[in-house]
Amino acid sequence: MTELRVAFRTLGCKLNQLETESIADRFAASGARIVPFESGADLYVINTCTVTGKAEQKARRTIRQALAACPSSVVLVTGCYAQMDPGAISALDQRAVVVPGDEKARVLDLAAWLDSHWQGHGDLLHAVLEWRSGMSVPSTPIAPLASITLSIPGVTGSASQPGADHFAYHPNAFSFHSRPGLKIQDGCDNRCTYCRVCIARGSSISLASPEVLSRVRALESSGKAEVVLTGVNLAQYRDGNLRFPELLRMLHEGTDRIAFRISSYEPEKIDEEFLAAFALPRIRPHVHLALQSGSDSVLKRMARPYTAARVRQAVASLRAAKEDPFVGVDLISGFPGETDVEFAETLGLCRELDFAWIHAFPFSARPGTKAWDMRPCVPERIAGERVAILGALAHSGKASFAARQAGKTLDLVLEQSAAGSDGLSAPFRFGTSANYLKICVEGVPPGIRAGTAVRVLVSADTPENTPESQVELDPEHSDSDLHARFLGLA
């Protein structure tokens, strides 16, 4: 195949990031050249999100940018927004080819199809449309409570589309991340009143535990130091009677060196079984809780199955299980009817529990959810002010957590110094610590590659003029890096 330039942009969750990595891996294996999104590309692949209205606006803006970058390029759009509103995307331009989220796994086959059928001859758009028309299962929107039993080996649960392999995403190489993710669960059985991810991704399904272990062992054998266990709702992982805590134990017992990071978890599921697994040595001291509010009355309107008291108990238990773990939370501000008193309850809980990070965002009414029609609406200005207050608390909490690391010896995984570049001789290297801090490391010997676990000594100072622009930082860490000195391999 004539060298095809392909660029990728991922919007939304870690699950989307992993799925994009897998698609990029297939293109790279076929001989395509993966290029930065800002560069000219023949094919753009955009993996979208539908969690908020702003996420959809960002998706449309990104699509338009790709269309404008090169008049002959093809822009393939997939993901949750493509699932929920394919017509709005198709209307942007004839070069915007939509693959709804429930068919996303089929994009994994596009590179091989182009290699066999297109081979660089003729119009790329015509070729992609021909491939798209040959996809065997037509996409239909997922009903909120739809549940179709799967018949795929190694998968348990239900899904929106029979025969769709929701767990085909397992790249051999990672183009955009040094710490690989592993998708073990998809979909959600909760019906939170504000969320339509359950509509876009369907009911909960899980990758069978023997296959999870097999994939983790493959990552460990390839030299990966850490794997991020990823799903829409990890607390709903099921393989028969085996739940997520038992899976963690099985993975820990079945491997030798690789560490495990939990992408996110539900507060009410922080129970004795989870805590026992969390306390295991190679489970990273980091949990991100889907809190959403600290007010019992707001949580009830959200249909969240816990109270502020349960959150207090969960956080205290996490801190008892591991020394000073990184505990972050998601919060929605301006949920319909949220009063000043209710917001004060949320703010008070956050101050009391001193979270290491708060990801706060304003409520966005989503079509098809119960909250769409809830009243009274909180004015956008007030919701924004509340987000700003929580944001300030987030940064002070992160700074306090980071300051407690001064003088400590930490393990971390080195990151790439630039998209697709190891930066083996860079004066500074960046890495993500076991407790989820972005750290600038000095004195790393040349030749140590991204993805390697190293041990560092954290100093109290942050280096000036470090090349932070060379690394694509996680937004949670872009303003709170620490400085450390390389001690050796971990």
Where in this protein do the model-derived segments appear?
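Proteins enriched for Cys/Gly/acidic motifs involved in redox and nucleic-acid/cofactor modification
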Residues: 1-230, 235-236, 287, 309-320, ...
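Residue-level signal for inorganic ion chemistry
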Residues: 45, 80, 229, 262, ...
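Short, solvent-exposed loop/turn segments at secondary-structure boundaries
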Residues: 55-57, 203-208, 238-242, 301-304, ...
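Conserved SAM/AdoMet-binding glycine-rich loop
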Residues: 75-76, 84-85, 220-343
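Short, hinge-like loop/turn segments at secondary-structure boundaries
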Residues: 93-94, 115-117, 246-247, 278-279, ...
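Contiguous mid-protein beta-loop-alpha structural module that forms a pocket-lining wall or clamp
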Residues: 338, 353-355
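Terminal RNA-binding accessory module
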Residues: 373-490
